[in-house]
Amino acid sequence: MVVLKPDKIGDADFANYFCTYGYLYHQKDMLEDQKRMTAYHDSVRLNPKQFKDKVVLDVGTGSGILAIWAAQCGARKVYAVEATYMAVHARKLVAANGLENVVEVSLFLFVYLYFRTSIWAIRLTDVVFLYP
């Protein structure tokens, strides 16, 4: 695993931002926010044509719920990227939904996707970006 070391100036901000999202209680709070989840659910589940046979990049996947919904809407492949160890829980949820062949959960920061040439070899018109 490659770990990104932040600049010295922003160490505290970087650590505080990412450590908060790494706890289950924080994910639970977001999942229980009915307005948030209804908006996300409707934007994905009510627009299956936007996801059918597409490649989806879910940056900051957290629990993986958006990645799961995208896969359920027919996405060909979903790259679910998470910078915290919440990725471990997201992988379990993806597997529990039987989607591990479609959803790939990765524990690393977005910058490292530049090295994953398989993503960028796909026409951009076939890529859907999920970034809440």
Predicted regions and their residues:
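Intrinsically disordered, low-complexity glycine/charged-rich regulatory or linker segments
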Residues: 1-28, 32, 38
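Conserved alpha-helix/loop element of class I SAM-dependent methyltransferases that forms part
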Residues: 35-54
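Conserved class I S-adenosyl-L-methionine
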Residues: 52-62
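Conserved SAM-binding loop of SAM-dependent methyltransferases across substrates and taxa
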Residues: 63-76
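Conserved SAM-binding motif I beta-strand of class I
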Residues: 77-83
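Conserved short alpha-helix immediately C-terminal to the canonical SAM/SAH-binding motif I
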Residues: 85-89
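S-adenosyl-L-methionine
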Residues: 91-112, 118
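N-terminal low-complexity segments that are often proline-rich with Ser/Thr-Pro
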Residues: 112-131
